[in-house]
């Protein structure tokens, strides 16, 4: 299943119709019908994707206990970067996770704690036994988000390497972003063929990953094809290339998320995406293929998180314009989620 924008087809029809409408009306009618069918198919694909995301969203019921709808771990946060793990963690809670744990460096912990009393903060990431400390919590977690605010300190990266190995051994889904992607670019074997991994690179991060695993030059005119090829080169893991359109591939198909956002790009909105995706991938895997109509649960989760992030951006921009920040976007999570995915 793929969703394609129909803007290109519309432009072609607009250019040709002026030349042929008067003299070749049958051809004009054919072109108009082609555009109509293209638009109808794109709209149907979009509606199907929205429904698949709605299918994985758990019902709110008094029969559940705390933790069932998501216990998410965020791995990141160092002296320089404390906002990113907070953004990812609080976004996970706003989307609907019950509990969020942040595993960060000791110096980052008091700052992150001060941002929100709702996050459970573990100041262990720069300790000599960081892997063992995080391993103790892994059986309680449904998904990990690795990379927000991580930085590139050798000790932290080495500890995260061990955490990723332990995560794979326990078959826990993992979303990798930011400097977690830098680590993967240095050692692609860390996540190669791990089908519960999702990478969320921006353009620069995507190019770095491409250079690390593919010898051929990247075709900047075929971003969908490039996303597909990078996923295949990494063993068909899910890749989300963020950009003007978000392109999502598991090496077999490509989904396109072109939900309206805004022209404002503020630092931290990728953390909103990764935190949201951590929750949604848990929901999608728990729901299973029967709820995703045979589609990859990870693809459905990724498309849902991308769509939500773009809608938060749109809503915040309508209110704040150029001054929009990620904090403003996070405030919109509840209304955006209801607008998109609540029936």
Curated annotation (Swiss-Prot):
Modified residues annotated as Phosphotyrosine in this record: 81
Reactions it catalyzes: (6S)-NADHX + ATP = ADP + phosphate + NADH + H(+); (6S)-NADPHX + ATP = ADP + phosphate + NADPH + H(+)
Top-level taxon of origin: Eukaryota
EC category: lyase
A GO cellular component annotation in the UniProt record: endoplasmic reticulum
PTM annotation (N6-acetyllysine): residues: 63
Alphabetized Pfam families for the sequence: Carb_kinase
Cofactor: Mg(2+)
EC code: 4.2.1.93
Record bears the keyword Phosphoprotein: yes
Transit peptide feature, positions: 1-42
Domain (YjeF C-terminal) ranges: 49-340
Gene Ontology biological process: nicotinamide nucleotide metabolic process
Binding site for (6S)-NADPHX: 149, 202-208, 271
Record localization: Mitochondrion
InterPro entries: CARKD, Ribokinase-like
Family: Belongs to the NnrD/CARKD family.
Function per UniProt: Catalyzes the dehydration of the S-form of NAD(P)HX at the expense of ATP, which is converted to ADP. Together with NAD(P)HX epimerase, which catalyzes the epimerization of the S- and R-forms, the enzyme allows the repair of both epimers of NAD(P)HX, a damaged form of NAD(P)H that is a result of enzymatic or heat-dependent hydration.
Protein name: ATP-dependent (S)-NAD(P)H-hydrate dehydratase
Record organism: Mus musculus (Mouse)
